[in-house]
C-alpha cells in the first residue's frame, strides 16, 4: 500500500504512544496514517509496566492479547533505597488477583501495539521517517505557555522519506508527534525542550542468565527490584523477563559515571564497568553471583526533560517526544499511553464538535503536564533518599525500612488508586503522597512560605488575594504552581478515574463510537493549590 497524499490525522512514531493513539482514533472511524522510522520488531529499553496498563489496553481491546502472550507477570516491585530494608509495592493486594502487570520484551510488546493499530483500521507504514513539517499561520493569541500551549502556526503537511530513498509529502488536519526522544516538534520547531539538571544521567545495561531469583521461596519471588548504590551515585534495576533472562541496568549521574570510568584500570571492558556499578548494590549483587552475561552491554544518555508546551493548533505531543523522567518507578509506558489516550480524546472531541481546538488542546496539555509533574516529584523524593543515604528523607530515624513510605507512594507508583479505596479517600491518598514528597524535598519546610500560602487561602475571593499573589517571589510562585498542579490530579487507575478528571470544565468521554470531551462545571476548590492565577 502506498502512503496516501492526505489523511485526517498523521501520527509520527510507531512506539507505544503513537501506536496507541492511532488505534484509539482508528476505532472511532478516523482516517489515520501512522509512520514508523524503523521496522518491527526492533529493540528498545523500558521493559517494566505499571498496573494502569491493563485499563489502558482494555480500552482498545488489547488486554487479553498481552495476557495470553506469556510476558513475565509483575505482581509488585521492591525498592531498596539505602541500607534499610526494602519497601515493596504489592499490585495484587491493592488491585485484586488480576491486578498484576508485566515485564515485557519491548521488541515483542511494541510490535503487538503497532500491529493492533493496523487491525484497528489505521494505515501503518514502517521504515518511513518524518523529515519536516509545514505550518500555516493560525490567528489565535490564546495558546500560551501558561496553559502548556504554543502557537507556531497550524501544521498542514509533512515531508517523509523511506529507508530505501523514496520520499513524498502528506497533508493532514491533525498531527501527533510520537517520535520519542527525537521529538521532532519540540526539538526542531518549538525548540522548547528543557533538561532537568538533577537528572543528567547515564544508563548502562545488559542481560544475564542463571541468577538467583529475588526473594526466593516467597510469594514475592522473581519480582523486580530497584536498589540504590551504597555511595549514593545512582541505582540499579533487576528485571526478570519471560525469555529466561534478567535485565540488569545501572543509572548514574553523568559526571560521576565519567569519573568512575576514568578511575578504572586501562583496558576495563564495558561488562566490567557495569559489574563495578552493580557491586555497589549488595542485594542485587548477591542474586547475580551465579549468573552469566548473555548479551552485549548497551549504554545511553538517560536525561530527564520536559517542555513549556505539549500542544498547539491541531497538534499534540505524546510520550517521550514531550517529556521523560528517570525510570526508577517505571513511569514511561504509563505516561506514553495515558498521553496517547488524551491525544486521541482531544482530537476526536474537535472532530465531533464537542469543543473548539483551543479548549481541546488545553485540556490535553494540562493532562500531560499534571501526570508528568506528579511522577517527577515522587521520583525526585526517592532519588534524594538514594543520594543522601543515611539521612531520613522518606523514613523516620527509628524506622527499619520504607514500607510506610511506599504505602503512601503506592497510588502514584502503581499508576492507579487502590480498588478498595473509596472515591473520597482517593483524593486524601494522593494528597498524602504529595505531602510526603514535598516534605522530603523541603518544599514546605519554609515556615515563611507556609505563612504566605495560608494568607492567600484565607484571602480567597478578595482584592487582598491579588495583592498577596503579587508579593510572591518567582520561587514562591513556582512552588504555588507546583502545588496547584499536583493537588488537582487523581492517580490514573480504572478508566473512570481518567474520565472523572475535570480540567477547565471538561471531562473525557471514554466510549467507543463517541470518544471525546464533555463539558462540565469548572472545579472551584478551597486550597491554595488550586487557585486560578
Curated annotation (Swiss-Prot):
Reaction catalysed by this enzyme: griseophenone C + FADH2 + chloride + O2 = griseophenone B + FAD + 2 H2O + H(+)
Superkingdom: Eukaryota
Keywords assigned: FAD, Flavoprotein, Monooxygenase, Oxidoreductase
Enzyme Commission numbers on file: 1.14.14.-
Biotech relevance: Griseofulvin is a spirocyclic fungal natural product used in treatment of fungal dermatophytes.
Mutant phenotype after disruption: Impairs the production of griseofulvin, but accumulates the intermediate dechlorogriseofulvin.
InterPro entries: FAD-bd (IPR002938), FAD/NAD-bd_sf (IPR036188), Flavin-dep_Halogenase_NPB (IPR050816)
Amino acids binding FAD: 14, 17, 47
Ligand binding (chloride): 331-332
Biological process annotations from GO: griseofulvin biosynthetic process; terpenoid biosynthetic process
Keyword Flavoprotein: yes
GO molecular function, one term: FAD binding
Entry annotated with the keyword Repeat: no
Pathway annotation: Secondary metabolite biosynthesis; terpenoid biosynthesis
Purpose of the protein: Flavin-dependent halogenase; part of the gene cluster that mediates the biosynthesis of griseofulvin, an important antifungal drug that has been in use for a long time for treating dermatophyte infections. The first step of the pathway is the formation of the heptaketide backbone by gsfA which is initiated by priming with acetyl-CoA, followed by sequential condensations of 6 malonyl-CoA units. The resulting benzophenone can undergo a spontaneous dehydration to form norlichexanthone.
Family according to the record: Belongs to the flavin-dependent halogenase family.
Protein name: Flavin-dependent halogenase gsfI
Amino acid at each position: 500500500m502506498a502512503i496516501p497524499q492526505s489523511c485526517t490525522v498523521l501520527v509520527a512514531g510507531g512506539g507505544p504512544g503513537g501506536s496507541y493513539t492511532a488505534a484509539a482514533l482508528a476505532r472511532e472511524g478516523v482516517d489515520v496514517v501512522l509512520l514508523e522510522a524503523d521496522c518491527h520488531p526492533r529493540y528498545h529499553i523500558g521493559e517494566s509496566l505499571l498496573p494502569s496498563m491493563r485499563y489502558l489496553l482494555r480500552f482498545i481491546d488489547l488486554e487479553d492479547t498481552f495476557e495470553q502472550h506469556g510476558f513475565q507477570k509483575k505482581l509488585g516491585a521492591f525498592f531498596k533505597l539505602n541500607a534499610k530494608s526494602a519497601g515493596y509495592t504489592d499490585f495484587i493486594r491493592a488491585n485484586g488477583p488480576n491486578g498484576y502487570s508485566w515485564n515485557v520484551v519491548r521488541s515483542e510488546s511494541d510490535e503487538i501495539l503497532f500491529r493492533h493499530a493496523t487491525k484497528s483500521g489505521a494505515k501503518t507504514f514502517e521504515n518511513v521517517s518524518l523529515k519536516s513539517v509545514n505550518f500555516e499561520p493560525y490567528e489565535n493569541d490564546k495558546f500560551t505557555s501558561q496553559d502548556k500551549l504554543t502557537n507556531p502556526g497550524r501544521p498542514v503537511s509533512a515531508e517523509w522519506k523511506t529507508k530505501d530513498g523514496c520520499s513524498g509529502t502528506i497533508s493532514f488536519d491533525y498531527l501527533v508527534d510520537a517520535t520519542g526522544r527525537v521529538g521532532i516538534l519540540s526539538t526542531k520547531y518549538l525548540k522548547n525542550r528543557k533538561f532537568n539538571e538533577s537528572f543528567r544521567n547515564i544508563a548502562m545495561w545488559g542481560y544475564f542468565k542463571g541468577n538467583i531469583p529475588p526473594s526466593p521461596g516467597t510469594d514475592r519471588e522473581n519480582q523486580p527490584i530497584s536498589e540504590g548504590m551504597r555511595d549514593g551515585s545512582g541505582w540499579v534495576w533487576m528485571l526478570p523477563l519471560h525469555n529466561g533472562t534478567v535485565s540488569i541496568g545501572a543509572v548514574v549521574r553523568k559526571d560521576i559515571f565519567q569519573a568512575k570510568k576514568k578511575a578504572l584500570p586501562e583496558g576495563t571492558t564495558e561488562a566490567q564497568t557495569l559489574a563495578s556499578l552493580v557491586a555497589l548494590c549488595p542485594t542485587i549483587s548477591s542474586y547475580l553471583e551465579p549468573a552469566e552475561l548473555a548479551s552485549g552491554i548497551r549504554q545511553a544518555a538517560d536525561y530527564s526533560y520536559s517542555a513549556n508546551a505539549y500542544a498547539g493548533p491541531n497538534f499534540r505531543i505524546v510520550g517521550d517526544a514531550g517529556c521523560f523522567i528517570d525510570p526508577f518507578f517505571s513511569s514511561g509506558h504509563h505516561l506514553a499511553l495515558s498521553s496517547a489516550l488524551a491525544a486521541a480524546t482531544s482530537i476526536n472531541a474537535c472532530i465531533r464538535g464537542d469543543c473548539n481546538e483551543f479548549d481541546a488542546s488545553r485540556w490535553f496539555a494540562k493532562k500531560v503536564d499534571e501526570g508528568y509533574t506528579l511522577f517527577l516529584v515522587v521520583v525526585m523524593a526517592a532519588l534524594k533518599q538514594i543520594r543522601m543515604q543515611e539521612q531520613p528523607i522518606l523514613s523516620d530515624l527509628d524506622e527499619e525500612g520504607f514500607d510506610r513510605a511506599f504505602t503512601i507512594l503506592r497510588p502514584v507508583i502503581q499508576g492507579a488508586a487502590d480498588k478498595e479505596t473509596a472515591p473520597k479517600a482517593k483524593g486524601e491518598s494522593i494528597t498524602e503522597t504529595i505531602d510526603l514528597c514535598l516534605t522530603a524535598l523541603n518544599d514546605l519546610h519554609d515556615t515563611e512560605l507556609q505563612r504566605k500560602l495560608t494568607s492567600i487561602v484565607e484571602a480567597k475571593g478578595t482584592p487582598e488575594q491579588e495583592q498577596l499573589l503579587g508579593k510572591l517571589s518567582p520561587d514562591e510562585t513556582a512552588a504555588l504552581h507546583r502545588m496547584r498542579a499536583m493537588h488537582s490530579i487523581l492517580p490514573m487507575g480504572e478508566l473512570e478515574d481518567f474520565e472523572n478528571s475535570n480540567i477547565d470544565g471538561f471531562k473525557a468521554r471514554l466510549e467507543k463510537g463517541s470518544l471525546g470531551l464533555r463539558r462540565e462545571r469548572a472545579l472551584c476548590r478551597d486550597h491554595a493549590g488550586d487557585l486560578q492565577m
